[in-house]
Amino acid sequence: WFLYDEPKQELVTYYGDYFRKVNFEIKPLLVKIFTEEFSKTDIGGTKIKNPLEYILLLTSELKTQRPESTTIAFFLKQQGMDLFNPPNVKGWDGGKSWLTSQIYLQRNNVADLLSSGKSIPRSKLERENTLNKKQAFSISLDWNTKGTNKEIIKELTDRLLFSTDTSLQQDLEKILKYDFDPQSLGANDAVLRLFNAIIKSPEFQLI
């Protein structure tokens, strides 16, 4: 649950045997899992972000003003995570259930809104009004204001993604081009467009 959405059967057996060995004590089991699994180098991209992890990471990166708890709760419910009201004692299914086509579309819409400094609307009328508003709140993204386009792309992808490939790199270089000037008037907006593209990528949905 902490590291894998779908752990391999040998891991389940390995830790299950240890759990029995320590007389079903939770603490030593968790210590063993965290000690052994977190030290591995290949655990990146093994879990899909749940809605809470997703929205908190976005608001943290953009340094938004503290969102209203009701707004966050509304977004989570839209995503199928009615906070403090799981469907059963097991909790939410998690895993691939956090990345249906509808949920992915909702996430991308929220990414667009937050990257342009707009709040998450909670009603049809509010959605229509939000689309026509200028920035509803200030946002601030940390990036190297002296870097080249490739250096800034690397900075953000290293921070936000567990891995990249040539195709994604090329797509990002089309957004933040080789002649990018970090001191130009529109530099921050250009980097925000890059950030928006990264957080809308399938790779960003993974931990």
Where are these regions (language model features)?
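Flexible, low-complexity segments enriched for small/polar residues
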Residues: 1-22, 27-207
